[in-house]
Amino acid sequence: MAVAKADILDAIAGMTVLELSELIKEMEDKFGVSAAAAAVAVAAPAAGAGAAAAAEEQTEFTVMLNSAGEKKVEVIKVVRAATGLGLKEAKDLVDGAPKAVKEGVSKADADALKKQLEEAGASVEVK
């Protein structure tokens, strides 16, 4: 009796997380494999290729505040608006420069924030 792949997928879809965990453990025991080792072995070559691709096209950027310049109050206002920080936290961030203002933002957002901070008198860098 052959079991269709769709039937297997439907049965798995109806399982709880605990049942899935037990199923994986039983499959590892029956076939003498480890699901974690397979994931690491597959991910390792991709990481090497991904590093080269990441160097070519970076998608997440960090806006670094190098110095507040002469208009520190204006820079604090921009930092507060961009990050949602409170006055004290924004002031501490500006006083502690060089520091990251925002991390993991798109190129457009990073450039817009850099422009706002520079207009306020800050020295800014996008990494």
Curated annotation (Swiss-Prot):
Record keywords, A-Z: Ribonucleoprotein, Ribosomal protein
GO molecular function: mRNA binding; structural constituent of ribosome
Entry keyword Cell inner membrane: no
Any Pfam family matching the protein: Ribosomal_L12_N
GO biological process: translation
GO CC terms of this entry: cytosolic large ribosomal subunit
CDD domains: Ribosomal_L7_L12
Function: Forms part of the ribosomal stalk which helps the ribosome interact with GTP-bound translation factors. Is thus essential for accurate translation.
Similarity remark: Belongs to the bacterial ribosomal protein bL12 family.
Subunit organization: Homodimer. Part of the ribosomal stalk of the 50S ribosomal subunit. Forms a multimeric L10(L12)X complex, where L10 forms an elongated spine to which 2 to 4 L12 dimers bind in a sequential fashion. Binds GTP-bound translation factors.
Protein name (Swiss-Prot/TrEMBL): Large ribosomal subunit protein bL12
